[in-house]
Amino acid sequence: MSLVHMNIALAFTVALLGLLMYRSHLMSSLLCLEGMMLTLFIMGTIMILNTHFTLASMLPIILLVFAACEAAVGLSLLVMVSNTYGVDYVQNLNLLQC
């Protein structure tokens, strides 16, 4: 495994650990999710370029489209929660609260 692949795998692991450890605030969770999507995009692009599999060159673009949709939904959810409760805690997303 080359140094570039190890760095990308490490970046994905750090983003995943950040998502698991700092899950109290919605903004930090969204940032970790975006970091994971960015590393998946870079890893997919590098793999496609290394294998010369040009038929799959559209897959990273599709991943970016889904990442943009996820970011838009996440930010709208963040705005809704912060306007309703005044804070961006993930525990405020529980619909079973009274």
From Swiss-Prot:
GO process annotations (BP)? ATP synthesis coupled electron transport
Please classify the protein's predominant subcellular localization into one broad category. mitochondrion
Q: Can you list the GO cellular component terms from the UniProt entry? A: mitochondrial inner membrane; respiratory chain complex I
Its family remark reads: Belongs to the complex I subunit 4L family.
Q: Name one Pfam family in it.
A: Oxidored_q2
Sorted alphabetically, the keyword list is: Electron transport, Membrane, Mitochondrion, Mitochondrion inner membrane, NAD, Respiratory chain, Translocase, Transmembrane, Transmembrane helix, Transport, Ubiquinone
Q: Which reaction does it catalyse?
A: a ubiquinone + NADH + 5 H(+)(in) = a ubiquinol + NAD(+) + 4 H(+)(out)
Q: What class of enzyme is it?
A: translocase
Top-level taxonomic group: Eukaryota
* UniProt name for this protein: NADH-ubiquinone oxidoreductase chain 4L
Q: Where does it live in the cell?
A: Mitochondrion inner membrane
Protein task: Core subunit of the mitochondrial membrane respiratory chain NADH dehydrogenase (Complex I) which catalyzes electron transfer from NADH through the respiratory chain, using ubiquinone as an electron acceptor. Part of the enzyme membrane arm which is embedded in the lipid bilayer and involved in proton translocation.
Q: How does it assemble?
A: Core subunit of respiratory chain NADH dehydrogenase (Complex I) which is composed of 45 different subunits.
Q: What is its EC number?
A: 7.1.1.2
Spans through the membrane: 1-21, 29-49, 61-81
InterPro entries linked to this entry: NADH_UbQ_OxRdtase_chain4L/K (IPR001133), NUOK/Mnh_C1-like (IPR039428)
Signal sequence span per UniProt? Answer: none
Is Nucleus among the key words of this record? no
GO MF annotations, alphabetized: NADH dehydrogenase (ubiquinone) activity
Give the membrane topology.
Answer: Multi-pass membrane protein
Q: Which organism is it from?
A: Sorex unguiculatus (Long-clawed shrew)
